[in-house]
Swiss-Prot record:
SMART domains: Cupin_1. This is Germin-like protein 5-1. It comes from the Eukaryota. Residues 1-20 form the signal peptide. Oligomer (believed to be a pentamer but probably hexamer). The lineage of its organism: Eukaryota, Viridiplantae, Streptophyta, Embryophyta, Tracheophyta. It is found in: Secreted, Extracellular space, Apoplast. CDD domains: cupin_OxOx. Glycans are attached at residue 172. Belongs to the germin family.
Length: 230
């Protein structure tokens, strides 16, 4: 017990000294790289936190290059995900050289009237730039304020979303819209708020009490979602 006490005291002393000398301690989800780069080797069967590194001698400029951000994600291709329900298509920017660099990116296309519904990235902040069209874009602050911070963005506008906060976009115009989103994690994660509550196999009475409604209403809304079975 005495040893634990001395260790804790030493830790507190080090933190105090660091603060006194203006040292900033940063805690991140993605670890710092230990080499100049670690180009992902998708053929490797090794499983690590990230992807194994390609032989540096075999690395080329193409490993740090992606062509296609200027093309609609609706064109499909590798890394494309479409949602008819919400009217958007997202395509990840596939750059093997981003492996271990704590970053990822995607192009998102939203049809007129479409939305990217309220969602959050548990492991990343986001910066989005509008490539075409106009969207209502913003985020919601944490409880208890639940303040909406949002505005209409047009081509060339940039908006930042803090890590872990619920955010959304709505193309309420008559033209298609497109955005380029960069995230501060190689694996930012994506949680759709409505799907997490209504598509997950949660007890119906729990969902009803959460939404301050009755079970019949929950069942009616759930019929519009794909209910995942555990």
């Amino acid at each position: 017990m005495a040893m634990v006490g001395r260790s804790l005291l030493l830790l507190l002393l080090l933190v105090t000294l660091a603060a006194g000398h203006g040292v900033v301690v940063v805690v991140a989800f993605d670890p710092n790289p230990l080499q100049d780069f670690c180009v992902a080797d998708p053929t490797s069967k090794v499983r690590v936190n990230g992807l194994p590194c390609k032989d540096p001698a075999a690395v080329t400029a193409d490993d740090f290059f992606f062509s296609g951000v200027g093309e609609p994600a609706a064109g499909g291709g590798r890394g494309a995900t479409a949602s008819r329900r919400y009217g958007f298509t997202a395509r990840s920017v596939d750059i093997p050289g981003l492996n271990t660099l704590g970053a990822s990116a995607a192009r998102v296309d939203v049809a007129p009237g479409g939305v990217f519904p309220p969602h959050y990235h548990p492991r990343a902040s986001e910066t989005a730039v509008v490539l075409a069209g106009a969207v209502y874009f913003g985020f919601v602050t944490s409880y208890p304020d639940s303040r909406v911070v949002a505005k209409v963005l047009r081509r060339g506008d940039v908006f930042a979303v803090p890590q872990g906060l619920v955010h959304f976009l709505h193309n309420n115009g008559s033209e298609p819209a497109a955005l380029y989103a960069s995230l501060s994690s190689q694996n930012p994660g994506l949680v759709l708020v409505a799907d997490a509550l209504l598509a997950a196999p949660l007890p119906v009475d729990l969902v009803a009490k959460t939404l301050l409604t009755d079970e019949a209403t929950v069942d009616k809304i759930r019929a519009n979602f794909i209910v995942h079975r555990s």
